[in-house]
């Protein structure tokens, strides 16, 4: 408990400092710094609010216990306050527990169809719609940076930016990070005339997005920028100039494309953001692997080459193989109802982090 008190005191001091900065008009002349301060303020706010409520309940409980000897109504009130105090103490401990430093971050997500041809592309499209529906329900905004649709409405590959609509302690990374890996589907494809169940797959890659490109060192001589004409199905939204951008990072071979913005400058800026996110992720994973070479699995990330989840349509079943999670509500999950699954994954990650401390 003493450790919690010390930690909260430090957070209260930091929170008050951030509050003073946000009240300073000069801060808002520097948009990047203002975003960072606002983001950190939002991350600390739930801790401050929970701690304030816990202190108030503790004071009320002491008063109620003193009066309980004379009035039975206060005895009942004291019992209620004891329960609330215990709940708040548990909540505060959870808020103070070790957490992923990127949990408040926006993300870049890539979804790619795997083995299975057109059926795999259709499944990749369903995964994208599942994420879009979840995002709509939970205050996230999705921007498509680049995509390659198929004739039947599937997706060969797509790159998206997923952002919180307002600063939050729990950003897009806090939930979508669990999606990195191979997703397998079992069902009768629409193209299958014999009614046989087939298996196909789609791969998902997720990267936390740096607050600023400048946070990641990218040397101009290490990149090659190519421009080309944007593709599309026609209409006013299609660019008629060479505005699409492809950036190749020469040392790593990473290639990033963006064609959804209205100008070449905007497409290059967004492509650089995606490249920065991918390079940051590579650097962190290399450092983490070196620091935890004696462990079979990393704490923060799952192996992106492994099969993490199976979507079984005949049984309406979804299975997450990392935590032995099974549920027969696949139809609801594909409609964006991922709350139970994400909650189970977050609990497992939290337990693993506490064990590693």
Curated annotation (Swiss-Prot):
<dbReference type="GO" id="GO:0016149">
    <property type="term" value="F:translation release factor activity, codon specific"/>
</dbReference>
<dbReference type="GO" id="GO:0005737">
    <property type="term" value="C:cytoplasm"/>
</dbReference>
<dbReference type="InterPro" id="IPR004373">
    <property type="entry name" value="RF-1"/>
</dbReference>
<comment type="function">
    <text>Peptide chain release factor 1 directs the termination of translation in response to the peptide chain termination codons UAG and UAA.</text>
</comment>
<keyword id="KW-0963">Cytoplasm</keyword>
<comment type="similarity">
    <text>Belongs to the prokaryotic/mitochondrial release factor family.</text>
</comment>
<dbReference type="Pfam" id="PF03462">
    <property type="entry name" value="PCRF"/>
</dbReference>
<dbReference type="Pfam" id="PF00472">
    <property type="entry name" value="RF-1"/>
</dbReference>
<dbReference type="InterPro" id="IPR050057">
    <property type="entry name" value="Prokaryotic/Mito_RF"/>
</dbReference>
<feature type="modified residue" description="N5-methylglutamine">
    <location>
        <position position="236"/>
    </location>
</feature>
<dbReference type="InterPro" id="IPR005139">
    <property type="entry name" value="PCRF"/>
</dbReference>
<dbReference type="InterPro" id="IPR000352">
    <property type="entry name" value="Pep_chain_release_fac_I"/>
</dbReference>
<protein>
    <recommendedName>
        <fullName>Peptide chain release factor 1</fullName>
    </recommendedName>
</protein>
<keyword id="KW-0488">Methylation</keyword>
<dbReference type="InterPro" id="IPR045853">
    <property type="entry name" value="Pep_chain_release_fac_I_sf"/>
</dbReference>
<keyword id="KW-0648">Protein biosynthesis</keyword>
């Amino acid at each position: 408990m003493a450790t919690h008190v010390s930690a909260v005191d430090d957070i209260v001091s930091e929170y008050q400092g951030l509050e003073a900065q946000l009240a300073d008009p000069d801060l808002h002349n520097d948009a990047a710094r203002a975003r960072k301060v606002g983001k950190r303020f939002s991350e600390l706010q739930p801790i401050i609010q929970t701690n304030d409520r816990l202190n108030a309940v503790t004071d009320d409980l002491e008063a109620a216990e003193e009066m309980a000897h004379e009035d039975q109504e206060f005895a009942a009130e004291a019992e209620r306050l004891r329960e609330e105090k215990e709940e708040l103490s548990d909540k505060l401990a959870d808020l103070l527990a070790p957490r992923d430093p990127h949990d408040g971050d926006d993300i870049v997500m890539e979804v790619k169809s795997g083995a299975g041809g057109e059926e795999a592309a259709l499944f990749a499209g369903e995964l994208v719609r599942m994420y879009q529906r979840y995002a709509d329900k939970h205050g996230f905004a999705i921007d498509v940076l680049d995509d390659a649709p198929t004739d039947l409405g599937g997706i060969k590959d797509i790159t998206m930016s997923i952002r919180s609509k307002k600063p939050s302690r729990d950003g897009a990374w806090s939930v979508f990070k669990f999606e990195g890996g191979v997703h397998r589907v079992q069902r009768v494809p629409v193209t299958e005339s014999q009614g046989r169940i087939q298996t196909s797959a789609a791969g998902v890659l997720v990267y936390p997005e740096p607050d600023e490109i400048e946070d990641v060192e990218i040397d101009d001589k290490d990149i090659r920028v190519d421009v080309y004409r944007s593709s599309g199905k026609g209409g006013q939204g299609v660019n008629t100039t060479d505005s699409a951008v492809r950036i190749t990072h020469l040392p790593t071979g990473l290639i990033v494309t963006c064609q959804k913005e209205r100008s070449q400058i905007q497409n290059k800026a967004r492509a650089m953001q995606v490249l920065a996110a991918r390079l940051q992720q590579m650097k962190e994973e290399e450092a983490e692997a070196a620091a935890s070479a004696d462990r079979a699995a990393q704490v923060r990330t799952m192996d992106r080459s492994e099969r993490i989840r199976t979507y079984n349509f005949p049984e309406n079943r979804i299975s997450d193989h990392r935590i032995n999670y099974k549920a027969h509500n696949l139809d609801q999950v594909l409609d964006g109802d991922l709350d139970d699954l994400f909650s189970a994954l977050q609990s497992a990650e939290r337990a693993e982090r506490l064990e590693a401390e």
